[in-house]
Regions:
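Gly/Pro- and small hydrophobic-enriched strand-loop and loop-to-helix capping segments
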Residues: 245-259
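Conserved alpha/beta-domain cores
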Residues: 2-6, 12-235, 241-243, 255
Length: 259
């Protein structure tokens, strides 16, 4: 189970790129290329921020570690990476258990970014710090009921189907008011913002989602921690940052292709 004293998510990208003086221990020798890839992505995020006159501490890098071994996660944790995203619940639970006893991994912040089935909500509520794929009230209700009292409220993002396609996951923009109205009353959930996975052809998806995010912020001043806009991956990270993303999700560019 996660550490109740863990600090909430914050940026993990060094403001000073010269700060990269890689410190590795013996177990990291086989992961030098991983460290270099992570450093390169950090630099790309910083450069994207600089291009639009944003501070690097406005954007958090979420390292998507699905299908990758716990050893790789530990290596990046030793470098300072704190936020990790997992799609597959059973695999994630195994990593959380393996890494839980390692001092350098105690401050890891785990994000669940996969689809949520009703029979999996308890494990998610008990083991993750963030859920980025909330799209239905019934799931929110279960997460709220199953979040242990000794843990801080579970941070949640609403996944928005910004393309309004029937085949895609996410809450339709038109249904957001009703879902927000329900979630904001759950004491064991902390509603933090929105997440999208837009179609490549949807060229204005980022701008539209940013506008949604700002509209909700104005309409719901009671959401005091409404501060997170998770959008952008390896191929469109810079565009997302230019449109106000506060969290980018990067997997393959850091960890390499699936084995």
């Amino acid at each position: 189970m996660i550490d109740i004293f863990k600090q909430p998510h914050k940026n993990n990208i060094p403001n000073d790129m010269a700060a990269f003086d890689t410190q590795t221990d013996e177990s990291d020798v086989n992961n030098i290329s991983l460290i270099e890839s992570w450093q390169q992505v950090c630099k790309q995020v910083a450069q994207a921020c600089a291009q639009v006159k944003r501070q690097t501490d406005e954007v958090t890098l979420l390292a998507v570690s699905k299908t990758k071994p716990a050893e790789m996660v530990a290596t990046l944790a030793r470098q300072g990476q704190r936020d990790f995203g997992e799609n597959y619940l059973q695999e994630a639970l195994e990593k959380i258990q393996v890494l839980g006893g390692q001092p350098e991994c105690e401050s890891i912040i785990w994000h669940y970014i996969g689809s949520i089935q009703r029979n999996k909500t308890r494990d998610i509520a008990e083991n993750f710090d963030w859920v980025q794929t909330l799209e239905r009230e019934i799931i929110a209700k279960r997460l709220n009921e199953q979040r242990p009292a000794e843990l801080s409220p579970l941070n949640v993002l609403i996944q928005v189907n910004i393309d309004t396609e029937d085949s895609k996951s996410g809450c339709l923009p038109a249904d957001l008011p009703e879902l927000i109205a329900a979630i904001k009353h759950y004491e064991r959930l902390q509603l933090r913002g929105l997440m999208i996975i837009p179609a490549k052809a949807n060229i204005d998806a980022f701008a539209r989602t940013k506008q949604l995010f700002e509209d909700i912020k104005i309409e719901h001043p009671e959401l005091q921690q409404w501060d997170t806009l998770s959008m952008g991956m390896s191929g469109d990270m810079s565009e997302a940052i230019a449109n106000g993303s506060t969290m980018v999700r990067v997997g393959t560019t850091i960890f390499g292709a699936r084995a």
